[in-house]
Amino acid sequence: EVINNISKCVDGQFPEINKRRHVWSFKNGVFVGKEWMPDKGIYECRFYSYESDKFKCLDPSIIACKYFDQQFDDFSHIERWQDIPTPFFDSVLKYQKFEDEVCDWAYVMGGRLCYDVGELDAWQVIPFFKGIARSGKSTLITKVFKKFYENEDVGTLSNNIEKKFGLSAIKDGFMFIAPEVKGDLALEQAEFQSMVSGEDVSIAVKNKTAMS
């Protein structure tokens, strides 16, 4: 009875803590990756320093999805996002001698991982890096994109994923990665396409009713 009451009651003094996938905290402030600007009619990214008056006006119930033990460098004054210095990420792309347009799209696709499928666009695509061993694929996936969130919030899709219950392992994450994918990926093509397009997918869970 006590467990049932605690799990279902709504109490302002005992709020339910839910991470915001668009909010990250740093030593010097909080970065909000999606904030509605009513005067412009668009969503924007904003950084709030802990000492600023605007930070004090933020909703205190907001929970950051991850804390980075470092200072945040605010480059909001730079007009073109392509001019923001990212030397380490650039080094991987430039080593492959990609054209600037290809490099730009690598950043675009990486940024889309911080949002739900179809949240800000209807492109129905996901990033996929193809290449030989030691070309930088896993470095970008596991050392950059995966670090956007805590390990518990990033699911891993293996090449030999269990056909029936495999998706249940990644359904609750903010992001999923697949570091090694071959031509014999065990995931059904129809399910994969539905995941990419943002359609409802029936997910079988052991000893439970299927979810979507």
Regions found by a protein language model. Name each.
Residues 25, 44-46, 202:
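Ser/Thr- (and often Asn-) enriched beta-sheet segments in non-cytosolic proteins
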